[in-house]
Amino acid sequence: MSTMEEEKVISKSTSVDISEGTFDDITIEKKEEAKLVRKLDWYLMPMFSVLYFLSFLDRANIGNAAVVGLKEDLKLQAYQYSAAVSVFYATYITAETPSVLLVKKFGPHYYLSAMIIGWSLVTIFTCFVRHYWSLVLTRLLLGICEGGFFPCLSLYISMTYKREEQGKRLAYLYVCSCFSGAFGGLIATGLTKIPKSSGLPNWGWLYIIEGLISAISALWILFCLPDDPSTARFLNPREKELMKIRAEQRQKYMGSPNFDWTQFRKAFKDPKMYMSCVIQFCQDLVLYGISTFLPSILKLELGYSSLAAQYMSVPVYALGGISVYVICLLSDRTNIRGWFIIGMNFFGLAGFIILLATTNSAANYVATYLIALPLYPTVALNITWINNNMAPHYRRATALGCNQTIGNLAGVIAGQVYRSSPYKLGHGFALGCTVVGTLTATAMRFYLQRQNKIKQEILNGERVDEKKERDGCDALDFVYVL
């Protein structure tokens, strides 16, 4: 790498000739690069955020439907409702790893729009469910259709943005998942006013309205999402040139666009992937337990009415949305992931201890706010962390797929441990997972620090390099994000 005096700074008036040297010798003017990133944000992030909002809304609306009469109309026992919640993840997790490996082959705009149309139709037809087994079937189908959506969005973000830019962009998605909880509660509250004489139960209209909105939104992806962000139609020639420079500067991180079984196998030999999966499982169990069952916790455990439970869940989700944005923004600015995950989890620990230690409704309601603080940022930052530290593309795609598959197994468990009120088993399990997740994040942080030190010692000639081959994130000049 050249020194700062030797680097060529590319400003608006400068054109790039590859024959002049390597892209590593080129630094884009900061103001111009910031303008490019803002343009990418304005085009891509509203699309991704709205669509992830809708996917989370369609997935989690069973919690709101239960509060407004689904369980009574279908005559569901507590174990049947829990099973219906959990079974979604049985098919959801099977779709994740194949999706991140196939999305490049079929093109993101076709692949993602097909997913959206699929889950929209399943959501709409859920309004006709009249017994337990038909509800289970729709949940299984919904899992198949939604399974690869979030991992593919995460992968697309890693293709478009630099490592230090990714946390904030994933935060946008999680902000929307927070507000889907709040929005779902408000919709459910409004639908309690629709008379049953309209031909459908109140919860049936919930599925129809949300499914139709999702179906229409599929057109946005189909016609507006570029398969390759560096050649997007919304970029002018100068911006495409800058995207090419950014891509070349990240070549070790991105790697070859062709599928490589070697990188697939290397992912499974990497300790980072396994630690990331443990963290994801633990944080996802808390996320799915609270995001799905919060209205039921407020109604059945804290004793509030159905209407009050829906209203009172809104500010809890809103706090989670604010938290994920602020924490991920700070994480990007400091380029630190691990300490934020570890530190935020202490709020969750305090919240679950309160829920387990007292039956006072006011104290328990305050505890839900403490739990909301780390609920979304810890999940978002762990995904960003593994995205940042796995390279090239197909090693990262494999690790991300496994991360999401293992993480979403927690959805199956959450539905079983949050089976019936009082939810002491669920809260205890979530407390234990928070402890394990915190300890694993601490171990991963120090492991990465140690690996960075080893690489630097090899570069300094202080240690013999025992690896015969180094590529991607194993390269000596690839510095792990802590």
UniProtKB/Swiss-Prot annotation:
The keyword Transport applies. Pfam families: MFS_1 (PF07690). Keywords: Endoplasmic reticulum, Membrane, Transmembrane, Transmembrane helix, Transport. It is found in: Endoplasmic reticulum; Membrane. It comes from the Eukaryota. One of its GO terms (molecular function) is transmembrane transporter activity. The chain crosses the membrane at residues 40-57, 83-103, 109-129, 140-160, 170-190, 205-225, 278-298, 311-331, 338-358, 366-386, 399-418, 428-448. The keyword Iron does not apply. GO terms for cellular component: endoplasmic reticulum; membrane; plasma membrane. InterPro entries: MFS, MFS_dom, MFS_trans_sf. One of its GO terms (biological process) is carboxylic acid transmembrane transport. It is a multi-pass membrane protein. Belongs to the major facilitator superfamily. Allantoate permease family. This is Uncharacterized transporter C1683.12. It comes from Schizosaccharomyces pombe (strain 972 / ATCC 24843) (Fission yeast).
